[in-house]
A protein has these predicted regions:
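Polyanion-binding surfaces on beta-sheet-dominated domains and ring/shell assemblies
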Residues: 1-146
């Protein structure tokens, strides 16, 4: 895949076009598959290396009307060779902390919210769709026109 990457936008196009991140995690309680932030990062690492890029995260705790949110910003940096300079693109996502989560202390709740917000920042940046395909709901019924 080694192409001449001129800027962060070229890198983003290449990464989005080549990123494969299947939903390999299983939720047995809800009987569905999913991917988490770590899965996305694992799939991204070879592509980041190939395009001379890296990801940096910044988290911010925000309070809105007695609710606490974690605001995660993912920044894709493209290193311009031999110049010690980079160009970047950012994407931000929010996740709300639940007031109580059974079996978790406060730091675990914040950590889980951070991971969730980071996952959705990565989804936005790299055009990862977490929804079911529209055909999933079709049930082999013909479409009707109204």
């Amino acid at each position: 895949m080694k192409n001449k990457i001129e800027n962060v936008h070229d890198a983003l196009v290449l990464i989005q076009g080549n990123l494969k991140c299947p939903k390999n995690q299983k939720n047995t309680f809800g009987n569905y598959s999913y991917r988490n932030c770590e899965d996305i990062l694992q799939a991204l690492k070879p592509l980041l290396k190939e395009t001379d890029c890296y990801i940096k995260f910044d988290d911010e705790i925000i309070s809105v009307m007695d609710r606490v949110y974690v605001k995660a910003t993912a920044t894709l940096h493209h290193i311009i060779s031999n110049q010690h300079v980079s160009t970047w693109i950012t994407c931000t996502a929010l996740a709300r902390e639940p007031e109580i989560k059974k079996g978790m202390d406060l730091s675990q709740i914040t950590g889980a919210s951070s991971s969730y917000a980071r996952k959705y920042a990565l989804n936005g940046m790299f055009a990862i769709d977490d929804n079911k395909d529209a055909d999933f709901y079709n049930n082999n019924e013909p479409a009707t026109v109204t």
